[in-house]
């Protein structure tokens, strides 16, 4: 049995840290508004990105990290109540 811990790269650690931060903030928000599904949205988005973005596309991952950090700051605002999702019409 292999008991050596998994070693993550710096980028993987940054993504995991951002994910945990999002979940912590969303849990606090959902205590204020139990009908909110912020954590479900966050989990869905992270899983979607994990399946659609190649692990070797470091530039894309880094840009999404920056975008995610900005979004995290926004949801930490006491006035934040949820995400607005816009889906463009297909032609």
Curated annotation (Swiss-Prot):
Subcellular location: Mitochondrion matrix
A GO CC term attached to the entry: mitochondrion
InterPro entries in the record: Complex1_LYR_dom, Complex1_LYR_SDHAF1_LYRM8
Record-linked Pfam families: Complex1_LYR
Gene Ontology BP terms: mitochondrial respiratory chain complex II assembly
Swiss-Prot/TrEMBL keywords: Chaperone, Mitochondrion
UniProt record similarity statement: Belongs to the complex I LYR family. SDHAF1 subfamily.
Subunit structure: Interacts with the iron-sulfur protein subunit within the SDH catalytic dimer.
Role, per record: Plays an essential role in the assembly of succinate dehydrogenase (SDH), an enzyme complex (also referred to as respiratory complex II) that is a component of both the tricarboxylic acid (TCA) cycle and the mitochondrial electron transport chain, and which couples the oxidation of succinate to fumarate with the reduction of ubiquinone (coenzyme Q) to ubiquinol. Promotes maturation of the iron-sulfur protein subunit of the SDH catalytic dimer, protecting it from the deleterious effects of oxidants. May act together with SDHAF3.
Stated name of the protein: Succinate dehydrogenase assembly factor 1A, mitochondrial
Protein encoded by which gene: sdhaf1A
